[in-house]
């Protein structure tokens, strides 16, 4: 059985900021491509969410075409993936999301 996905407010804000950035500095096509890439990564996580553990119980899934990492945790008992943040890897590591 696949996991359900719960996206945090911080992650939603991260995604909105990335889309706004790509709309402003590139094109709407690039912004749509970012959203498509994010959704594709989430779909890849759902059937098998056991990616690399980054910190404590937080896992990471790097995006391929964009410099972002998806941070998430698992509730294995209830089969829920909690997406905590979508972090731009071009920012300094000091700015990593406070998990």
Kindly give the residue locations of the regions a language model identified.
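Basic, Lys/Arg-enriched alpha-helical interface segments
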Residues: 1-57
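Basic/aromatic recognition patch in beta-strand/loop cores that engages polyanionic ligands
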Residues: 39-40, 48-80
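Enriched for short, Lys/Arg-rich terminal
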Residues: 73-99
């Amino acid at each position: 059985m696949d996991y359900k996905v719960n996206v945090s407010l911080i992650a939603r804000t991260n995604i909105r900021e990335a889309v706004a950035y790509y709309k402003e500095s590139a094109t709407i096509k690039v912004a749509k491509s970012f959203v498509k890439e994010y959704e594709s990564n989430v779909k890849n996580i759902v059937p098998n969410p056991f990616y690399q553990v980054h910190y404590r119980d937080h896992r990471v899934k790097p995006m391929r075409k964009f410099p972002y990492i998806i941070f998430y945790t698992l509730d294995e008992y209830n089969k829920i993936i909690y997406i905590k943040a979508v972090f731009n890897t071009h920012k300094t590591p000091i700015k990593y999301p406070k998990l």
